[in-house]
Amino acid sequence: MPAGVAAWRRDRRHAGTARPARCADTALFRTNPQLEKYEMNALLAGLTLLIIGDSHVTFKDSLLSVLPDEFTKQGAKVVTYGVCSSTAADWVVPNPNNGCGAAERVGDAPIGAPDMKPASPPPITSLIEKWHPNVVMVILGDTMAAYGQNAVSKDWVDEQVKTLTYAIGKTACIWVGPTWGQFSPRYGKTDQRATEMASFLKGEVAPCSYVDGTALLKQGSVNTIDGIHATPESYRVWGDAIVQATLPELEKLKDAPPAPAQ
């Protein structure tokens, strides 16, 4: 039994039946930090969350470190797959990456080195069949934003997104779009293109709900190592913002039954 509960019970026995003492003791019980910690840990109990995405969820000290840890602390069962350079349709139609990295993490298990062999993302339908998630969280956007090119092919992005959302089917989903970066010649990411892509995705990802990554953080606040991939500190800030933005919806969805097999 937590020490705070034991102390509360002793105080109740010695306090008699006076109403003020009971009210004061109850207030102490409700604000005990140790007990609040137990309540927080149960916030997402019963929820199975499947996270998929590109390089932002592939490497140690990226969102692969932040999101599974934080959602597991809230009581969720979390399974995460990241494949560097993957686009939305790659999670439906097999398309090997260039060997820049792939990762799988169950819960908050230790993060090992990514698999650097060229590999296709596992099909989303097989992942749903395997893990029976209540919710799929998609972390994608940068790989489809055509950074360094004159324009985004919106028809192509539309096809990419619709291919994935159709395959996700009746399973609830949350799509997290790109956030800010820094310009570098390597990728050519600009705030203007990030804003354009984030806004376009908002109207594309239904029936998934959408989290605009550029709305979570202040423009110019994200530090990167190469223009796109954030520093560990900025990944922590971005990840924490994603958690806070999605917790209310995840809490509502935790009691929803997993979608039937398609």
UniProtKB/Swiss-Prot annotation:
InterPro entries per UniProt: SGNH_hydro_sf (IPR036514)
GO biological processes: cellulose biosynthetic process
Keywords: Cellulose biosynthesis
Protein's pathway: Glycan metabolism; bacterial cellulose biosynthesis
Domain of life according to the entry: Bacteria
Any one GO molecular function term: hydrolase activity, acting on ester bonds
Protein name in the entry: Protein BcsX
